[in-house]
């Protein structure tokens, strides 16, 4: 990435002096003094957590009193609210019920109710295949999941060669799964078109969102992006679509040598391979654990270099091509083709999450600088677009 190595907090200030040609011309918003992410839990949320655990888990959970249940917020979610629910030590287990679970409450539902049903089915299938946490309960507002002793990876750990290779292998195995969902790759542009229409239909009070749409000519730009990707070969596989550090758990008590687990499948679908890899590379830049407004940091210089991308690609292809014998020339061509594929689909990642964040700004109750983040993603889009020498002649 063509940027200096200093940390950039947030994106440019919406409505300020902007340039869509790169990040360096953008003005970052002034941090809001002493504004930190809240970790408090409302009494109503505590009560509802108790009711769901009691009803869906049964056993010892029915014997514990509401005030005895430990409900602690889990940081890291930008789409949902997460809580760790635990039984008190003095309440004995009665059977095979878990003693602690993860409660996921849906945030602003942008995908539609049908997508939530499909996600729950997907979650259950992956759990049965030991590829994800167990599912303990599903209800309209969210679900109860297995709490895994683990921690999410940190943004800077994505650059670690050993971890990067392991993530590539994990992604390749995910891509090789057969799932009972439509194989037509409509998810990417279908979702972006819906997001854009929802943004355009926002009330007139949502002026900052309208400014972003007009500033970047997003409708026309989406058509340009579609033309580029239509001319970019990329296999359709079952994609996670959100492999960022917060969705990769480092297990404390793994059942095998494989100590990484992918979680959060709400955006998973059959999609183009290039999007999943390009999206992961974009996430090398963003740290969502920043504790002050806008609650993320962007470091453009951390976008993976050519060599870092090749390391990932080689581990990915090694898993996909198990048993195949390729000449050195064939292998090199595959690597070069994949570099081009990824660089183009990385644009789609910026565009997708830029639209997503613009819409979240008008709906979400999660403390996060959604508009600042949207602007950062769109600026990255235009910067990386300008670096694609073959953009106009794919």
From Swiss-Prot:
ATP binds at residues 75-81, 104, 146-152, 244, 264. Its EC number is 2.7.1.32, 2.7.1.82. Keywords: Acetylation, ATP-binding, Kinase, Lipid biosynthesis, Lipid metabolism, Nucleotide-binding, Phospholipid biosynthesis, Phospholipid metabolism, Transferase. Substrate binds at residues 77-79. Coiled coil: none annotated. The keyword Thylakoid does not apply. The keyword Kinase applies. GO terms for cellular component: cytoplasm. One of its GO terms (molecular function) is choline kinase activity. CDD domains: ChoK_euk. Pathway: Phospholipid metabolism; phosphatidylethanolamine biosynthesis; phosphatidylethanolamine from ethanolamine: step 1/3. Residues 22-42 are annotated as: Disordered. The modification N-acetylalanine is found at residue 2. Belongs to the choline/ethanolamine kinase family. Homodimer, and heterodimer with CHKA. This is Choline/ethanolamine kinase. The gene is Chkb.
